[in-house]
A protein has these predicted regions:
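N-terminal amphipathic/basic leader segments beginning at the initiator methionine
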Residues: 2-21
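Short, well-structured alpha-helical segments in soluble
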Residues: 82-94
Length: 263
């Protein structure tokens, strides 16, 4: 897709998601013709509102694409043994091709132990350490985490040159920062990972052709923190002093300086 960026162009994720869905529908159709009906198992403990909202979104997306789903509802007080037993059963079920464990878990469950139980071949959310390691090695046979993958897909969709680009990733979590850095490195970008202890942070970010903000601090990136004409991907979801949702980037002060920015 050819995009001529004007100053401060807002780039959105929906066209990217729609294109990915279109491609997936074709892939699922081909699998069905071969006698394979892709199925996702969603494992949920209790009935937290955020889990239910995420689950509804996943079910809707799967329905659109043509992927079968099964919701495995577990009691809030489930034991470690019973949770792991449920996962092993899904691992062995040949009719289930993907497993999504909704998190965070209740306190009685040991997340570190659970992530070694899920089958890496069915771990669609990059929960397994094996899939995390594959990202570090540049091995594309595993499942990368969704949000870092979305960052790369958005940049590609809008024809942002990654090969040789100077990229600053603000945040070092295993949820976004580290995997996003590795995925961008695999695209031959030159990546600098920034965090709370980075010296001269503003100097580092203001030299980046592409800035990925994923630190979880409301509007911390201001005009002086970005390079003229840079591309900014704001992953942060925060609440500002007025109680409004906002990102890590102060969009109002940055938009006129950059070439493209996510809302």
């Amino acid at each position: 897709m050819e995009v001529t960026a004007t100053k401060g162009q807002i780039i959105k994720g929906k066209p990217v998601a729609d294109q990915i869905s279109e491609n997936l529908i074709k892939e699922v159709d081909e699998l069905v013709k071969e006698g394979i009906n892709p199925k996702l198992a969603i494992v949920r403990v209790g009935a937290r509102g955020d889990d239910l909202a995420y689950e509804r979104g996943a079910l809707k997306r799967c329905q659109t694409i043509g992927i079968e789903t099964e919701v495995v509802e577990l009691a809030e007080d489930i034991t470690q043994e019973d949770y792991e037993k449920t996962l092993r059963s899904l691992n062995e079920n040949k009719d289930v091709h993907g497993i999504l464990c909704l998190r965070p878990f209740p306190n009685q469950l040991n997340e570190e132990a659970i992530k070694y139980v899920i089958s890496p071949e069915k771990d669609v959310d990059c929960f397994s350490p094996i899939n995390s390691a594959k990202i570090m090695e540049g091995d594309k046979s595993g499942f990368p985490p969704c949000t870092p993958t979305a960052v790369v897909e958005i940049l590609k969709h809008y024809d942002v040159e990654l090969n040789g680009a100077n990229v600053a990733v603000l945040g070092r979590s295993m949820v976004v920062g580290k995997p996003a850095s590795m995925l961008l490195l695999n695209e031959n970008a030159t990546v600098t990972i920034c965090h709370s202890r980075t010296k001269n942070l503003e100097k580092v970010t203001s030299q980046a052709d592409i800035l990925v903000a994923a630190v979880g601090r409301a509007k911390m990136i201001k005009e002086n923190s970005v390079k003229e004409g840079a591309v900014v991907i704001d992953v942060g979801i925060n609440v500002d002093e007025n109680g409004n949702l906002c990102g890590d980037v102060d969009t109002a002060s940055v938009q006129d300086k950059v070439s493209m920015i996510t809302p």
